[in-house]
Design a protein with these regions (language model features):
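Short, Lys/Arg-enriched N-terminal segments with co-localized hydrophobic residues
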Residues: 1-16
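Hydrophobic alpha-helical segments at protein termini of multi-pass membrane proteins
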Residues: 13, 17-303
Length: 303
Protein backbone atom coordinates (compact mmCIF):
# COMPACT_ATOMS: atom_id res chain seq x y z
CA UNK A 1 0.00 0.00 0.00
CA UNK A 2 1.40 3.40 -0.99
CA UNK A 3 2.21 6.32 1.27
CA UNK A 4 -0.79 8.37 0.20
CA UNK A 5 -3.30 5.56 0.66
CA UNK A 6 -1.72 4.45 3.91
CA UNK A 7 -1.97 7.85 5.58
CA UNK A 8 -4.79 9.44 3.61
CA UNK A 9 -6.82 11.85 5.68
CA UNK A 10 -4.25 11.92 8.47
CA UNK A 11 -1.49 14.29 9.41
CA UNK A 12 2.09 13.26 9.93
CA UNK A 13 4.58 15.86 11.03
CA UNK A 14 2.12 18.59 10.03
CA UNK A 15 1.88 17.24 6.47
CA UNK A 16 -1.52 16.41 5.03
CA UNK A 17 -1.01 13.37 2.88
CA UNK A 18 -3.47 14.58 0.24
CA UNK A 19 -0.80 17.18 -0.58
CA UNK A 20 1.41 16.40 -3.55
CA UNK A 21 4.84 17.59 -4.57
CA UNK A 22 4.27 20.43 -7.10
CA UNK A 23 4.73 19.52 -10.74
CA UNK A 24 6.78 22.71 -11.18
CA UNK A 25 9.23 21.39 -8.60
CA UNK A 26 9.57 18.13 -10.51
CA UNK A 27 10.20 20.07 -13.73
CA UNK A 28 12.86 22.14 -11.95
CA UNK A 29 14.56 18.98 -10.71
CA UNK A 30 14.59 17.43 -14.17
CA UNK A 31 15.91 20.66 -15.69
CA UNK A 32 18.75 20.80 -13.15
CA UNK A 33 19.58 17.17 -13.89
CA UNK A 34 19.69 17.98 -17.59
CA UNK A 35 22.02 20.93 -17.03
CA UNK A 36 24.40 18.76 -15.02
CA UNK A 37 24.69 16.35 -17.94
CA UNK A 38 24.43 18.76 -20.87
CA UNK A 39 27.18 21.18 -19.84
CA UNK A 40 29.98 18.56 -19.74
CA UNK A 41 28.76 17.04 -23.01
CA UNK A 42 28.72 20.44 -24.75
CA UNK A 43 32.18 21.28 -23.42
CA UNK A 44 33.47 17.92 -24.63
CA UNK A 45 32.16 18.61 -28.14
CA UNK A 46 33.52 22.17 -28.19
CA UNK A 47 37.00 21.22 -27.02
CA UNK A 48 37.17 18.30 -29.45
CA UNK A 49 36.46 20.76 -32.26
CA UNK A 50 39.28 22.93 -30.94
CA UNK A 51 41.68 20.02 -31.29
CA UNK A 52 41.74 18.50 -27.81
CA UNK A 53 42.12 14.75 -27.41
CA UNK A 54 39.25 12.76 -25.93
CA UNK A 55 41.37 10.94 -23.31
CA UNK A 56 41.88 13.91 -20.92
CA UNK A 57 38.10 14.21 -20.48
CA UNK A 58 37.77 10.64 -19.25
CA UNK A 59 40.93 10.86 -17.16
CA UNK A 60 39.42 13.94 -15.52
CA UNK A 61 36.32 11.95 -14.64
CA UNK A 62 38.29 9.06 -13.18
CA UNK A 63 40.71 11.32 -11.31
CA UNK A 64 37.91 13.23 -9.60
CA UNK A 65 36.20 10.03 -8.44
CA UNK A 66 39.47 8.51 -7.21
CA UNK A 67 40.94 11.52 -5.44
CA UNK A 68 37.77 13.32 -4.24
CA UNK A 69 35.30 10.52 -3.62
CA UNK A 70 37.67 7.78 -2.51
CA UNK A 71 40.98 9.08 -1.16
CA UNK A 72 39.72 12.37 0.27
CA UNK A 73 36.71 10.79 1.96
CA UNK A 74 38.74 7.92 3.39
CA UNK A 75 41.24 10.38 4.85
CA UNK A 76 38.48 12.63 6.15
CA UNK A 77 36.76 9.66 7.79
CA UNK A 78 39.98 8.94 9.67
CA UNK A 79 40.49 12.57 10.71
CA UNK A 80 36.89 12.84 11.94
CA UNK A 81 37.66 10.18 14.55
CA UNK A 82 40.50 12.24 16.03
CA UNK A 83 39.87 14.39 19.14
CA UNK A 84 40.92 17.52 17.24
CA UNK A 85 37.91 17.16 14.95
CA UNK A 86 35.63 18.48 17.71
CA UNK A 87 37.77 21.61 17.91
CA UNK A 88 37.65 22.01 14.14
CA UNK A 89 33.87 21.70 13.85
CA UNK A 90 33.26 24.04 16.78
CA UNK A 91 34.85 26.93 14.87
CA UNK A 92 33.11 27.82 11.61
CA UNK A 93 36.09 29.59 10.06
CA UNK A 94 38.49 26.81 11.00
CA UNK A 95 36.06 24.22 9.67
CA UNK A 96 35.73 26.08 6.39
CA UNK A 97 39.51 26.32 5.98
CA UNK A 98 40.04 22.64 6.79
CA UNK A 99 37.26 21.56 4.41
CA UNK A 100 38.75 23.72 1.68
CA UNK A 101 42.24 22.41 2.40
CA UNK A 102 41.14 18.80 2.02
CA UNK A 103 39.40 19.52 -1.28
CA UNK A 104 42.30 21.59 -2.57
CA UNK A 105 45.06 19.17 -1.67
CA UNK A 106 43.37 16.04 -2.99
CA UNK A 107 41.79 17.43 -6.15
CA UNK A 108 44.76 19.53 -7.27
CA UNK A 109 47.17 16.72 -6.46
CA UNK A 110 44.96 14.46 -8.54
CA UNK A 111 45.23 16.87 -11.46
CA UNK A 112 49.00 17.16 -11.12
CA UNK A 113 49.40 13.38 -10.87
CA UNK A 114 47.25 12.82 -13.96
CA UNK A 115 49.17 15.40 -16.00
CA UNK A 116 52.52 13.93 -14.95
CA UNK A 117 51.60 10.30 -15.61
CA UNK A 118 48.74 9.08 -17.82
CA UNK A 119 48.50 12.37 -19.72
CA UNK A 120 52.24 12.93 -20.00
CA UNK A 121 52.24 12.28 -23.75
CA UNK A 122 49.26 14.60 -24.24
CA UNK A 123 50.93 17.67 -22.74
CA UNK A 124 52.04 18.93 -26.14
CA UNK A 125 48.45 20.01 -26.81
CA UNK A 126 47.40 22.68 -24.32
CA UNK A 127 43.74 22.30 -25.31
CA UNK A 128 43.86 19.10 -23.28
CA UNK A 129 44.02 21.17 -20.09
CA UNK A 130 40.56 22.51 -20.88
CA UNK A 131 39.29 19.07 -21.85
CA UNK A 132 40.54 17.61 -18.57
CA UNK A 133 38.85 20.39 -16.59
CA UNK A 134 35.57 19.68 -18.37
CA UNK A 135 35.81 16.02 -17.37
CA UNK A 136 36.87 16.72 -13.78
CA UNK A 137 34.16 19.30 -13.15
CA UNK A 138 31.66 17.53 -15.39
CA UNK A 139 31.62 14.24 -13.52
CA UNK A 140 31.23 16.16 -10.27
CA UNK A 141 28.15 17.87 -11.72
CA UNK A 142 26.71 14.56 -12.91
CA UNK A 143 27.25 12.86 -9.54
CA UNK A 144 26.32 15.68 -7.18
CA UNK A 145 23.61 17.38 -9.24
CA UNK A 146 22.17 15.18 -11.98
CA UNK A 147 22.09 11.90 -10.07
CA UNK A 148 20.57 13.57 -7.00
CA UNK A 149 17.92 15.40 -9.00
CA UNK A 150 16.98 12.30 -10.99
CA UNK A 151 16.46 10.30 -7.79
CA UNK A 152 14.46 13.16 -6.26
CA UNK A 153 12.30 13.34 -9.39
CA UNK A 154 11.61 9.61 -9.30
CA UNK A 155 10.71 9.84 -5.62
CA UNK A 156 8.41 12.83 -6.23
CA UNK A 157 6.57 11.06 -9.05
CA UNK A 158 6.18 7.90 -6.98
CA UNK A 159 5.01 9.87 -3.95
CA UNK A 160 2.41 11.76 -5.96
CA UNK A 161 1.18 8.45 -7.38
CA UNK A 162 0.87 6.94 -3.91
CA UNK A 163 3.67 4.44 -4.51
CA UNK A 164 6.23 3.53 -1.86
CA UNK A 165 9.69 4.67 -2.92
CA UNK A 166 13.12 3.43 -1.85
CA UNK A 167 14.45 6.95 -2.42
CA UNK A 168 12.66 8.72 0.41
CA UNK A 169 9.82 8.93 2.88
CA UNK A 170 7.55 11.42 4.59
CA UNK A 171 10.35 13.74 5.70
CA UNK A 172 11.80 13.98 2.20
CA UNK A 173 8.35 14.59 0.76
CA UNK A 174 7.63 17.35 3.24
CA UNK A 175 10.92 19.02 2.39
CA UNK A 176 10.16 19.00 -1.35
CA UNK A 177 6.58 20.19 -0.83
CA UNK A 178 7.65 23.16 1.27
CA UNK A 179 10.64 24.08 -0.89
CA UNK A 180 10.12 26.82 -3.53
CA UNK A 181 10.73 25.42 -7.00
CA UNK A 182 13.46 27.95 -7.74
CA UNK A 183 15.55 26.54 -4.90
CA UNK A 184 15.83 23.36 -6.94
CA UNK A 185 17.49 25.35 -9.73
CA UNK A 186 20.28 26.72 -7.56
CA UNK A 187 22.28 23.54 -7.96
CA UNK A 188 22.40 24.09 -11.71
CA UNK A 189 23.52 27.70 -11.24
CA UNK A 190 26.21 26.59 -8.80
CA UNK A 191 27.55 23.84 -11.08
CA UNK A 192 28.16 26.32 -13.90
CA UNK A 193 30.47 28.30 -11.63
CA UNK A 194 32.07 25.12 -10.26
CA UNK A 195 32.91 23.75 -13.71
CA UNK A 196 34.35 27.14 -14.68
CA UNK A 197 36.55 27.02 -11.58
CA UNK A 198 37.66 23.46 -12.31
CA UNK A 199 38.70 24.36 -15.86
CA UNK A 200 40.60 27.44 -14.63
CA UNK A 201 42.46 25.48 -11.95
CA UNK A 202 43.21 22.75 -14.48
CA UNK A 203 44.98 25.34 -16.64
CA UNK A 204 47.18 26.41 -13.72
CA UNK A 205 48.14 22.86 -12.75
CA UNK A 206 48.63 21.91 -16.41
CA UNK A 207 51.40 24.44 -16.91
CA UNK A 208 52.87 23.58 -13.50
CA UNK A 209 53.20 19.97 -14.64
CA UNK A 210 54.40 20.94 -18.11
CA UNK A 211 57.07 23.44 -17.07
CA UNK A 212 59.17 22.96 -13.94
CA UNK A 213 59.75 26.72 -13.74
CA UNK A 214 56.00 27.15 -13.30
CA UNK A 215 55.68 24.56 -10.52
CA UNK A 216 54.52 27.30 -8.16
CA UNK A 217 51.20 27.30 -10.02
CA UNK A 218 50.44 23.93 -8.42
CA UNK A 219 50.48 25.11 -4.77
CA UNK A 220 48.74 28.29 -5.93
CA UNK A 221 45.91 26.15 -7.32
CA UNK A 222 45.62 24.39 -3.96
CA UNK A 223 45.35 27.71 -2.14
CA UNK A 224 42.79 29.06 -4.59
CA UNK A 225 40.70 25.89 -4.28
CA UNK A 226 40.93 26.18 -0.50
CA UNK A 227 39.82 29.80 -0.68
CA UNK A 228 36.69 29.32 -2.78
CA UNK A 229 35.52 26.27 -0.81
CA UNK A 230 36.20 27.98 2.52
CA UNK A 231 34.21 31.05 1.46
CA UNK A 232 31.23 28.90 0.46
CA UNK A 233 31.32 26.83 3.66
CA UNK A 234 31.73 29.81 5.98
CA UNK A 235 29.02 31.91 4.34
CA UNK A 236 26.63 28.96 4.28
CA UNK A 237 27.32 28.13 7.93
CA UNK A 238 26.76 31.77 8.87
CA UNK A 239 23.26 31.64 7.39
CA UNK A 240 23.99 34.08 4.58
CA UNK A 241 21.46 34.23 1.72
CA UNK A 242 22.05 31.58 -0.91
CA UNK A 243 22.08 34.26 -3.61
CA UNK A 244 24.87 36.15 -1.85
CA UNK A 245 26.85 32.91 -1.60
CA UNK A 246 26.36 32.16 -5.29
CA UNK A 247 27.24 35.74 -6.15
CA UNK A 248 30.48 35.46 -4.20
CA UNK A 249 31.33 32.16 -5.90
CA UNK A 250 30.69 33.68 -9.33
CA UNK A 251 32.92 36.67 -8.57
CA UNK A 252 35.67 34.27 -7.52
CA UNK A 253 35.09 32.15 -10.64
CA UNK A 254 35.50 35.20 -12.87
CA UNK A 255 38.73 36.13 -11.08
CA UNK A 256 40.02 32.59 -11.60
CA UNK A 257 39.19 32.78 -15.31
CA UNK A 258 41.11 36.05 -15.66
CA UNK A 259 44.10 34.47 -13.92
CA UNK A 260 43.90 31.31 -16.05
CA UNK A 261 43.71 33.32 -19.27
CA UNK A 262 46.78 35.31 -18.23
CA UNK A 263 48.72 32.13 -17.43
CA UNK A 264 47.56 30.58 -20.70
CA UNK A 265 48.74 33.52 -22.81
CA UNK A 266 52.18 33.50 -21.19
CA UNK A 267 52.76 29.76 -21.44
CA UNK A 268 50.65 28.40 -24.29
CA UNK A 269 52.52 26.79 -27.15
CA UNK A 270 51.00 25.80 -30.48
CA UNK A 271 51.70 22.38 -31.89
CA UNK A 272 53.41 22.39 -35.28
CA UNK A 273 50.70 20.20 -36.77
CA UNK A 274 47.99 22.49 -35.43
CA UNK A 275 49.20 25.63 -37.24
CA UNK A 276 51.54 25.12 -40.17
CA UNK A 277 53.66 28.10 -41.12
CA UNK A 278 51.99 30.07 -43.90
CA UNK A 279 55.29 31.51 -45.14
CA UNK A 280 57.17 28.22 -45.34
CA UNK A 281 58.88 27.79 -48.73
CA UNK A 282 57.28 25.22 -50.96
CA UNK A 283 59.67 22.76 -52.55
CA UNK A 284 58.70 21.87 -56.11
CA UNK A 285 59.48 18.27 -57.00
CA UNK A 286 59.79 17.63 -60.69
CA UNK A 287 58.00 14.71 -62.20
CA UNK A 288 60.30 11.89 -63.40
CA UNK A 289 59.17 12.26 -67.05
CA UNK A 290 59.84 16.00 -67.10
CA UNK A 291 63.25 15.54 -65.48
CA UNK A 292 64.20 12.90 -68.10
CA UNK A 293 63.17 15.19 -70.96
CA UNK A 294 65.27 18.06 -69.60
CA UNK A 295 68.28 15.75 -69.17
CA UNK A 296 67.92 14.52 -72.77
CA UNK A 297 67.70 18.07 -74.11
CA UNK A 298 70.81 19.05 -72.18
CA UNK A 299 72.72 16.07 -73.63
CA UNK A 300 71.76 16.99 -77.19
CA UNK A 301 72.93 20.56 -76.61
CA UNK A 302 76.32 19.40 -75.38
CA UNK A 303 76.66 17.12 -78.39
Amino acid sequence: MGLVQRYKGKKLGGLKMETIIPVLSIVAMLFSALVGIAVPVVLYIVYRKKGANHLPFWIGCVTFVLFAFVLERLTLTFVMKLPIWTTITSNLILYGVVAGLFAGVFEETGRFFAFKTVLRKKRGNDQNALMYGAGHGGIEAIILLSATMVLNSIFAIQFNAGIDSPFGGINEAQTLINMPFWMLLIGAVERLAAITIHISLSVLVWFAAKNGKRFWLFPLAILLHLFVDAVAVILSGAGVSVWIIEGAVYVIAIAFVILAVSVWKKNHTVQAEEKPAADAPVEVIEAPAEAAMEAEAETETQA
